[in-house]
From Swiss-Prot:
It comes from the Bacteria. GO terms for biological process: cell division; cell wall organization; peptidoglycan biosynthetic process; regulation of cell shape. ATP binds at residues 120-126. It comes from Rhodococcus jostii (strain RHA1). GO terms for molecular function: ATP binding; UDP-N-acetylmuramate-L-alanine ligase activity. Pathway: Cell wall biogenesis; peptidoglycan biosynthesis. Belongs to the MurCDEF family. This is UDP-N-acetylmuramate--L-alanine ligase. It holds the Pfam family Mur_ligase_M.
Length: 503
């Protein structure tokens, strides 16, 4: 007996090891479904799914559709990662098996729940994860589907016993318009995924259309510090959708400093200050209707994370959670896999890894890194006060997608200028074919700080180790295989313990 509609009782997933697909598979298995799938390579995610009962084949061929007795009732795929000539999709068409996209499955799994969906150009995964952790701390057991692994839970999805479903709503292909949300969080809105949408206007419109899908009595939570999401909030408030409320958060004030509203949008939470402390910080803010500010110690760095915390707070409160307990949960939030994740420390050099692959994300992460380098590791304080004061930020940046690199090369260069030293790798093409004249060198040309273009990924760890000194912070950055370099950089630092370049 399953807790699933008939069409989802036997599901085959093409690309099952991906972050989004593996999460859906976990929920299907937990609800009694039979799941098979294929992926290009073995991974930790694939092994975890096998342990839960999924039948997974490495490589793609038509025979994968026979992994489940009786074959699948439906085949699930994604727009971006799986080509239409994939042999499993071709075989599904030949057999007359329906092929649907991942968001359609997620929308079906959400039915019967109160849905809290987090959208925006950046910050979706971190905000969604923070919201989940806060609700769990408050005694809720929400179902959730997130684009990255929560450090606390070690998973990206869960079938909960409660009536709340929290999910990251991906706008990259417009698929978020399949959802029917009760609460929508919008962290920011600015041009991205233009290879799919074709224009900035079309990209922005998808957020308006998403907000219009809010249920009567629903809530839109939008960041007022971001021009794009603030404008969205103003449009939705002016439109007067039936029963839909709009709450803003951020540090922005109207002309007379009033708390009640900014440009017609009610302010639910105002950020008063964020002070970096060690690898986190202290957030001071005020909630609407309260006379006194509140303070919470956060375990993740960066002002952007402080804003994400306010978004999670307002959404969790709307779900019925207690504010004090929400803040305790936020204080205990340890981050998400590949979101300013600590890799290790060697000879006074701290190495972090981050998924940032858009200029705005790069700026936010490097801003947090600059705060961090001014808050040195306790061991560095003991070893040398001089080295602590002279620490610098070194970023190893791998551009993601040729189309995005061509569009944003100059903006990437300006964003990377927030680091003290920059190593630019070649483009990680993922699903795209190379474009003439587009490479990492295009980004490096726009960097005004000391920059090194390194097209050979294998040479980067030794190069970075030669640049680094005690007190420095190194960040490997990008959505591709740059993530593998963190431990290799630590190995290179161990191999050259006495080499510290002059500043």
């Amino acid at each position: 007996m399953t807790d699933l509609p008939a069409e989802l009782e036997r599901v085959h997933m093409v690309g099952i090891g991906g972050a989004g697909m593996s999460g859906i598979a976990r929920i299907l298995l937990a609800r009694g479904g039979q799941v098979s799938g294929s992926d290009a390579k073995e991974s930790r995610g694939v092994l975890a799914l096998r342990a839960r009962g999924a039948q997974v084949r490495i490589g793609h061929d038509a025979g994968a559709l026979d992994l489940l007795p009786g074959g699948p009732t439906v085949v699930v795929t994604t727009h971006a990662a799986i080509p239409k000539d994939n042999p499993e999709l071709v075989e599904a068409a030949r057999r007359g098996i329906p092929v649907i996209l991942r968001p359609a499955v997620l929308a079906s799994l959400m039915q019967g729940h109160r849905t809290l969906l987090v959208s925006g150009t950046h910050g979706k995964t971190s905000t969604t994860s923070m919201l989940v952790v806060a609700l769990q701390h408050c005694g809720f057991d929400p179902s959730f589907a997130v684009g990255g692994e929560l450090n606390e839970a070690g998973t990206n999805a869960h079938h909960g016993s409660g009536d709340v479903f929290v999910a990251e709503a991906d706008e990259s292909d417009g698929s978020l318009l399949q959802y029917e949300p009760d609460v929508v969080v919008v962290t920011n809105v600015e041009a991205d995924h233009l290879d799919y949408f074709g224009s900035t206007e079309a990209y922005i419109q998808v957020f308006d259309d998403f907000a219009a899908r809010l249920s009567p009595g629903g809530l839109l939570v939008a960041c007022l510090d971001d021009p794009g999401s603030a404008a969205l909030a103003q449009r939705v408030a002016a439109r007067g959708l039936p029963g839909v409320r709009v709450l803003g958060y951020g540090s922005a004030e109207d002309a007379d400093g009033a708390f009640a509203s900014v440009d017609g949008v009610e302010v639910g939470a105002r950020l008063l200050s964020f002070e970096a402390r060690d690898v986190g910080g202290v957030l001071q803010f005020q909630l609407a209707g309260e006379q006194s500010p509140r303070t919470v110690r956060m375990g993740v760095p960066g002002r952007h994370m402080a804003l994400n915390a306010l978004a999670a707070l307002l959404a969790a409160r709307e779900a019925g959670a207690d504010v004090d307990e929400i803040l305790e949960g936020i204080a205990g939030f340890g981050g998400v896999h590949r979101r300013f994740q600590f890799t290790g420390r060697e000879h006074g050099v701290r190495v972090f890894d981050d998924y940032a692959h858009h200029p705005t994300e790069v700026r936010a992460v490097l801003g947090a890194a600059a705060d961090l380098v001014r808050q040195p590791h306790e061991a560095d304080r003991r070893e040398s006060e001089d080295s602590v004061r002279s620490g610098k930020v070194i970023v190893v940046f791998q551009p993601h997608l040729y189309s995005r690199t061509a569009t944003f090369a100059e903006e990437f260069g300006h964003a990377l200028d927030l680091a003290d030293e920059v190593v630019v790798l070649d483009v990680y093409g993922a699903r795209e074919e190379p474009l003439p004249g587009v490479s990492g060198a295009l980004v490096a040309l726009s960097v005004s700080k000391p920059v090194h273009y390194q097209p050979d990924l294998s040479q980067a760890p030794r190069q970075v180790a030669a640049l680094a000194s005690p007190g420095d912070v190194v960040i490997t950055m990008g959505a591709g295989d740059v993530t593998m370099l963190g431990n290799q950089i630590l190995d290179a630092l161990r191999a050259a313990p006495h080499h510290h370049p002059s500043r």
